[in-house]
A protein has these predicted regions:
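A generic hydrophobic-segment detector
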Residues: 16-18, 22, 58, 140-145, ...
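Predominantly the C-terminal beta-signal and adjacent terminal strand-loop region
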Residues: 163-230
Length: 230
């Protein structure tokens, strides 16, 4: 009997990952937001055929929204200031807040470094949500507190596709394990509110919300026990 090693044998492994990412919005998403960041928690299981299946949860975070003057201009004075309770200035910061969850499958199509590492593709399908999140640093502007914010937050939900080209490196000594890659998120969404207070118009159209980005994933591998060969 002999023990399988990552260096010379294809192994079954569970991969737990934590990933920062940077995305550029495209299509309808670019009409609402500037570039944004994401943090991903992932689980993938690789079998002895170098095929994968798993789950990703992405949390989106951005610090800049397009057209804020148009969206919130009706709530400011002639100088563009937000006047809070008791006549104090309110400090308002608007950004993107969102999430995406996908079920993924994929495979290594070109091995490199060892039989468990190399270039791979992952394809996932799931759900996506994005909205404008407004932070009131002094808590003194009730006009943009719930439920009033709902008329301005551009909350959208819909079905999503996540396509990734990645390089996977599983260390021969099981110490340093990571993925780097390029990802395209494609979502077809619709406004949950159905109406925008600032425009006074119905918002019922489907949106094509795309984003493209780069990510780095730090992996914790958990190998199947007692893998051996004759």
């Amino acid at each position: 009997w002999g023990q399988l090693t990552t260096r010379d044998s294809v192994r079954t492994v569970q991969l737990w990952g934590l990933s920062p990412a940077f995305y550029l919005p495209v299509a309808d998403l670019a009409d609402r937001y500037e570039p944004f960041a994401a943090a991903t928690v992932s689980y993938q299981r690789k079998n002895k055929k170098n095929s994968f299946y798993g789950l990703d949860f992405d949390a989106f975070y951005g610090t800049s929204v397009k057209n804020t003057d148009a969206i919130f201009g009706g709530l400011t004075d002639e100088n563009g200031n937000y006047i809070g309770v008791n006549g104090e200035f309110a400090i308002m910061n608007a950004g993107l807040s969102g999430a995406q969850i996908t079920v993924n499958t994929g495979r290594i199509f070109k091995t490199n470094y060892n039989p468990n590492s190399g270039w791979m593709v992952l394809q996932g399908f799931g759900l996506q949500q994005t909205k404008i999140s407004v932070r009131n640093e002094r808590g003194n502007f009730p006009q943009l507190a719930p439920p009033m914010i709902y008329g301005y937050d551009r909350l959208h939900r819909g079905v999503a596709s996540k396509t990734s080209l990645r390089y996977l490196r599983l260390d021969n000594d099981e110490r340093i394990n990571f993925m780097v890659g390029f990802t395209v998120n494609t979502a077809v969404t619709r406004s949950v509110r159905g109406f925008n207070v600032d425009t006074g118009l119905e918002d019922a159209a489907l949106k094509l919300d795309l984003s493209v980005g780069l990510n780095f994933t730090w992996l914790l591998p958990v190998y199947a026990k007692q893998e051996s060969f004759f």
